[in-house]
Every structure is written in structure tokens, then in C-alpha cells.
Amino acid sequence: MSASLVGSEMCIRDSRKYRKMCRQIIRDFDNLPMTDEKKPRVGVVGEILVKFLPAANNYIVDLLESEGAEAVVPDLTDFLLYCCYNQNFKADYLGATAKSKRINNMLIRFFEWLRKDARDELAKSKHFEPTAYIQDLAKQAEHIVSCGNQTGEGWFLTGEMLELIAQGATNIVCAQPFACLPNHIVGKGVIKEIRHEYPGANIVAIDYDPGASEVNQLNRIKLMLSTAQKNLKKTNS
């Protein structure tokens, strides 16, 4: 669970203590001893359950790390902000009330207030990057898919992939339940366009289902990782 959700109650009770805790956690992690080893960064995106539940994605983070990659899993809080931000499009084009738009924008500002100190400290750190604003994710995605694509992960999935590429995680696993129609549109459906805009993008869509072959999943992920390792060697040479 993200820091903004875990610490929300603490922040409301004692905001000074919460801000200090956020800064100290980031500084402690930033000062951990590190080696010079370079690993390919692999982002994990997709349907919300399959993305975050290890039992649903066959422990993909453990798999990536065991294969010598650095797994990058975007924040859960951003999905909540995506749900709130959708009210802007609904109010502007689909007949939702202006009141619902105002309330959801207030919720976004509240969550961003919770994350402000952590974001500021991440921006000053040596090894970490601050999370993107949901408004920026929407702007990144809207030239490929409309913000009216709100079924499931909708435009947010496209925005996450673009943000990962911007942060240097050009290798991406798009995890989805078998035959998940929304993901076929905003996940698989946009991969070709993303590759057109970013030729270095190395994206693979993996279907997860009790009847799906785990061997097939593993082979496709390893093929993606093989390409990632080759690209990393080219970059370092």
C-alpha cells in the first residue's frame, strides 16, 4: 500500500510527524549502500488486481528480480486519483454534475497534499524519482487515447506506460486477465503506437488465467528480458 494511504490517518492527527517520517524514510533508502551493477528496468502495468496481487500474476516481481531485472511497479494511489480525475471528462462531456467534478478534484488535491512532502523529498534524492501528477498522466495519454476511455484502467494504463518510458523503464510487462476487453483496447491496442513514438520501447502483453500456460508466460517474459539485456549492453557500450 502506498505511503499516502498508510499515513493518511497519521497525517491528519500529526502532520508534522508524518512529514518528518516521509522525509526520513526516503533519506534512509537513498543512503543504502549500492553496487555499480546496471540492471534493465522493467515496469509492471495492467489490470489492477493482476498488477498488484502476486498470486494472480504468478509472482512476476520475484521472477523479474530473479532474472536480473529491476521491477518498477507504479503507485496504487494513482489508480484512485485516476478514478477521481475521470469525473472531469464526465462532467464536461457526459452529463455528470459540476458538483461531482468539484468534489473529486478536492479529493485529488487532498491526496496530493498527503504526498507533497514525499514527492519533494523524492525529487531531491539521488536514486528516486517523484510520482507524476494525474493531470500530467492524462496529458501524456490523450494524444493516443481519449480520456473518455474509462472502462477498467482506461487511459490511465496508457499514461502509466508512457510515464515509465519517460523515467527510463522502457521495458514493460502489461499484465491482464485472459480476454480482458478494456486492456485489449488501452493496453495491447496502443502498444504499436507507443513503439512507433518510442522505438526503444520493449513491451510485452501477458494474459493471466487459471487455464493459461505458465510456461508460455515465462517464455514471453524471458524473451522480453533478453531484448532488455541486449538494449542495456548497447546503451552502456
Per-region residue spans from a language model:
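Long, contiguous internal "core" modules enriched in hydrophobic/ aromatic residues
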Residues: 33-34, 45-53
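Redox- and metal-dependent alpha/beta enzyme cores, enriched for Fe-S-associated oxidoreductases
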Residues: 55-160, 167
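Iron-sulfur (Fe-S) cluster-binding modules
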Residues: 237
